[in-house]
């Protein structure tokens, strides 16, 4: 049985987008974007731990895209390495979820917000995390 709230993580080599569900698992909302500095994912995991504690997170949803091209294999390998570091730190169940096209959907959504392109770019990763988290919530209710 899935426990709520869920923290969704949209992994990236430069940014990690975060989103969270409510305590009933009905609604996803974007949180923040963590900047990855010098490939230091342990620092990001420390930040994620703080968010987990503050929000009483019970489950992690880690976005993993489907592999369509050989070039994407390296991305998946990096996500798997990040997942190992994350698992050591958070000690919560981690569910892998296909987040393919979540960034494209998030870009479309943000176009209608009338924000500057710079502001949209700052939010894109957390909105993408919210997109695939909401898809997950909808499929599990």
Question: Which residue ranges define each predicted feature?
Answer:
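Phosphate- and other anionic-substrate recognition elements at nucleic-acid/protein interfaces
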Residues: 2-7, 14-141
């Amino acid at each position: 049985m899935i426990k709520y709230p869920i923290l969704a993580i949209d992994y990236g080599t430069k940014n990690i987008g975060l989103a969270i569900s409510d305590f009933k698992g009905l609604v996803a909302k974007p949180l923040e974007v963590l900047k990855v500095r010098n490939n230091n994912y342990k620092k990001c995991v420390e930040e994620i731990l703080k968010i987990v504690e503050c929000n009483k997170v019970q489950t992690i949803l880690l976005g993993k895209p489907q592999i369509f091209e050989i070039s994407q294999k390296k991305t998946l390998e990096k996500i798997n390495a990040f997942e190992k570091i994350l698992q050591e730190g958070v000690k919560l169940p981690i569910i892998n979820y296909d987040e393919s096209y979540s960034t494209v959907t998030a870009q479309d959504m943000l176009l209608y917000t009338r924000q500057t392109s710079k502001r949209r770019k700052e939010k894109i990763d957390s909105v993408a995390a919210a997109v695939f988290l909401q898809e997950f919530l909808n499929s599990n209710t």
